[in-house]
C-alpha cells in the first residue's frame, strides 16, 4: 500500500492546504488512518504554545491521531525567517525522521509542500530536493486562474525531470468569476500526464469544511494498492 504523498502547487496560495485537507478526509472516510505533515511552514506566528502555522494546524485537525504539533510541523518559520534573504540551515534529517515516524503510525501521510515545486528554502535549496530524496509520489494542485495552464505544464515537466511520478492533479477554483473555467479544465485534462482526481469549487472558509466528497479516490485506485511506483 502506498503510504505517502507529496502535495505541490502551481504557485503560492493555490490551495495546497485545502486539497491536503480534502485528501485526508477522503482517505479517512474510506476507513484509513491518516496524518498530515507540513515539513517546513513559513509565516508562522508566536503563540503561548510556541510557533504555530495556520496551515499546519488545519492538517493537525484532520489527522486521525492526536499528535503533538511538532509531529505535524517540525520546522515553523516566522515571517522574518521565511524570507530567502534570511539565511538559515534547514535540518533535512529532522524532516525525514518526522516523516518516518508518522509513516509508522498511520496508513497514509499527506505531505504538504511550501510554495511551488522550485520554491526555495532559507538555504537556497528547493524543498523538492528533499522530496526526491524521500522518493515521494506527487499530487499537483492547480489553482484555476489566468496563466495556470503554463504553470501546470511547467510543474509537471519539472516533477518528471526530477524522476518522480506525478500521480494526479486537483483543480481548485480560486476565482469564482473566471471565464472559460470548463475549457481550462478540458485543456489541462488533455495535456497533463496524470488523471484529474478532484475539483474543488470556490468555497468561503474551505479550510473549515468537509471536502472529502470532492476527491475521487477511485482515480488513484491502482496507485493506492502498490508499495512503490516509478516515474
Curated annotation (Swiss-Prot):
Which parts of the sequence bind Mg(2+)?
A: 17, 55, 112
Annotated ATP binding sites: 13-18, 55, 112-115, 172-173, 201-203, 208
Pathway in which the depicted protein is active: Cofactor biosynthesis; biotin biosynthesis; biotin from 7,8-diaminononanoate: step 1/2
A Pfam family of the record is AAA_26
- Indicate the residues that form the catalytic site: 38
Q: Which family does it belong to?
A: Belongs to the dethiobiotin synthetase family.
**Name by which UniProt lists this protein:** ATP-dependent dethiobiotin synthetase BioD 2
Q: Which organism is it from?
A: Salmonella typhi
| Gene name linked to the record | bioD2
Amino acid at each position: 500500500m502506498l503510504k505517502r504523498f507529496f502535495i505541490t502547487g502551481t504557485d503560492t496560495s493555490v490551495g495546497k492546504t485545502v486539497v491536503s485537507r480534502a485528501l485526508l478526509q477522503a482517505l479517512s472516510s474510506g476507513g484509513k488512518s491518516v496524518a498530515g505533515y507540513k515539513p517546513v511552514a513559513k509565516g508562522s506566528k508566536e503563540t503561548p504554545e510556541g510557533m504555530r502555522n495556520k496551515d499546519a494546524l488545519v492538517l493537525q485537525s484532520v489527522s486521525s491521531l492526536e499528535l503533538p504539533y511538532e509531529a505535524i510541523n517540525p520546522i515553523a518559520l516566522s515571517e522574518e525567517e521565511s524570507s530567502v534573504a534570511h539565511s538559515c540551515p534547514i535540518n533535512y534529517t529532522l524532516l525525514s525522521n518526522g516523516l518516518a515516524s508518522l509513516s509508522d503510525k498511520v496508513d497514509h501521510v499527506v505531505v504538504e509542500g511550501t510554495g511551488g515545486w522550485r520554491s526555495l528554502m532559507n538555504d537556497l535549496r528547493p524543498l523538492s530536493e528533499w522530496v526526491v530524496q524521500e522518493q515521494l509520489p506527487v499530487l499537483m494542485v492547480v489553482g484555476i486562474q489566468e496563466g495556470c495552464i503554463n504553470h501546470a505544464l511547467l510543474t509537471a515537466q519539472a516533477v518528471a525531470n526530477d524522476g518522480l511520478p506525478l500521480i494526479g492533479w486537483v483543480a481548485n477554483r480560486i476565482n469564482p468569476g473566471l471565464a472559460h473555467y470548463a475549457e481550462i479544465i478540458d485543456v489541462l485534462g488533455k495535456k497533463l500526464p496524470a488523471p484529474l482526481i478532484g475539483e474543488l469549487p470556490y468555497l468561503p472558509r474551505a479550510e473549515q469544511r468537509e471536502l472529502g466528497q470532492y476527491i475521487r479516490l477511485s482515480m488513484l485506485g491502482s496507485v493506492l494498492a502498490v508499495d512503490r511506483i516509478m516515474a
